[in-house]
Design a protein with these regions (language model features):
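Hydrophobic protein-protein interaction segments
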Residues: 1-175
Length: 175
C-alpha cells in the first residue's frame, strides 16, 4: 500500500501527513520527517552507503494516494533514483503475481542487516501508529524468507522502472 519513505519526495511525504491528519492529530512535523528522509536518501547515494532493495506492490503506485501532480513527480523520482544505481533495486510486485505458497505480507516491513557480524539482523513492521521491532532469529528468518518470495515474484528492476514511468505519463495525461 505504501511507497517506501526512503524513496519519497518531500511533497509526497507532506501529502501523506496531510492525509493522516484527516484521521486525527499527528505528533510530528511533515517538514522534519521529509528532511530526515532526504538525509537518509543522501546516505543511500554515497559510494560507501548501504545497499537498498525494495519490493513495491503495484497497487501502491497506481492508487491515488496524493494529488496527481505530486504522485507523478513521486513516481518519476523513484525511477530516476533507482535507475543505474549499483546499490539500489526497486521491484514492482504485479497484482497478477503468483507468490510461492501464496505468502503475502500483512503489512509493510523492512529488514536491516549490518556490516558488523556482531550486530543482529532486525525487522521492523509498519503499523498504523508505530513500528514493531523484531529481533528473534525465527521471526527474522520468516520475514527474510517472505522477502525472498516477493523478490522472486516481482518484476525485474528495469521493467519496474519502465512501469513507474508509464504510470507517471498516464497521470500527466489524466491531470
Amino acid at each position: 500500500i505504501f511507497i517506501p519513505g526512503l524513496l519519497q519526495t518531500p511533497e509526497f511525504a507532506r501529502a501523506r501527513v496531510d492525509a493522516e491528519r484527516t484521521l486525527g492529530p499527528v505528533d510530528y512535523s511533515a517538514d522534519r520527517a521529509a528532511a530526515g528522509r532526504l538525509g537518509r536518501q543522501r546516505m543511500l547515494r554515497r559510494p560507501d552507503g548501504p545497499t537498498y532493495h525494495v519490493v513495491i506492490d503495484e497497487l501502491a503506485i497506481r492508487r491515488a494516494t496524493a494529488p496527481p501532480e505530486v504522485l507523478r513527480a513521486q513516481l518519476l523520482h523513484m525511477a530516476a533514483t533507482v535507475n543505474g544505481s549499483p546499490k539500489m533495486t526497486a521491484q514492482v510486485l504485479p497484482v497478477t503475481a503468483s507468490i510461492e505458497a501464496y505468502g503475502t505480507p500483512r503489512s509493510a516491513f523492512s529488514i536491516y542487516t549490518f556490516a558488523d557480524p556482531g550486530d543482529p539482523t532486525v525487522v521492523t513492521v509498519d503499523t498504523v501508529t508505530d513500528d514493531l521491532l523484531l529481533t528473534e532469529v525465527e521471526d527474522v528468518r520468516r520475514y527474510a524468507d517472505l522477502f525472498g518470495r516477493l523478490r522472486q515474484a516481482a518484476m525485474p528492476t528495469e521493467e519496474s522502472i519502465e512501469l513507474l514511468i508509464e504510470i507517471a505519463r498516464d497521470l500527466a495525461v489524466r491531470s
